Each structure stands twice: as C-alpha cells, then as structure tokens.
Amino acid sequence: MKIITAYQEFKEFRNSIKSISFVPTMGNLHKGHMALIDKAKSYDSHVSASIFINPLQFNDASDFNNYPKSLDDDIALLSKHGCDSVFIPDSSILENIKEIKAPDTATYLCGMNRPGHFDGVLTIVNKLFEITKPTRSFFGKKAVSYTHLRAHETPEHGGMR
C-alpha cells in the first residue's frame, strides 16, 4: 500500500490512475470503515483512503485534542483489507483552504448542537475531493447528513461529485 503525506505528491500520483474509489476518514478505523473499503474495491481498480483529523469540524478544542489517534493500527488495517493507497496529510492542507458554508438545512441535523461542524466537514471534504479527484466516494451511514449537505452545496463550490 502506498502511503502519501504531501498533497502535491497525491495530486501527481492521481494523474497516473484512471479511476479511484475514495474513502475519507478521520482515522480510528473500525469494521464500518473496512466495509467501505471492501465495497470500494468492488468498483474500481484503485482504492484510496484518507486519514485526517479535521480541526475545522470541532467547536470544542478539547474534543479535537482528545480524538482517538491510532495511525499505525489504521495503516495496518487498510493494508490488510487491500487498500491501494492512503493519503495522510498534515495541517498544511488547511492553508488557504476555501471555506464552505453549510446550507440552512444543517441546523435541522445535528448542526444545531454543533455550530460550525458541518462547515468544517464540507470544507475538508471539498479540499480532499480537489486533491484526490475521486471517481466514487464512500461514506458510512453516520455520514448520511454529510452527503445530504454535499448534494446541496452551491455550484460555485463545485457541487456534488
């Protein structure tokens, strides 16, 4: 499995791949994530995951600081399940990032209790999509609200991919 940490390197690597199934994660992987990897493998020849704990989606610094980190185990698990590459960017991915505002429907989801959460999710997913240019992307059931919001993203931000 290829491990890539620099986003420019991933962009260059992406040019050599015809199609890619992409599974964005924040790490601390479990069987639900592996089910997504397995599903992604059934579609394309190349499966890539990302691991990035996104500070933009935490409105409480202690939640971000206490988020579980299991990078070595995550890499081993992805490799065991046949993931072809993993993109593990550092915080420089956030430099000059285009901020995406969640639509008003976010307040009807859990956004009411987590101000800014969906803005942060949409912002990083948009950035990851700009870099990885996935043919397909896979999100778990927990992320249904993310895909709903992504589908309603405004055209000037790239819309749904």
Language-model features: where?
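Di-metal (Zn2+ and/or Mg2+/Mn2+) metal-binding site signature of metallo-dependent hydrolases
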Residues: 25-40
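Residue-level detector of structured alpha->beta connecting loops
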Residues: 18, 44-45, 82, 133
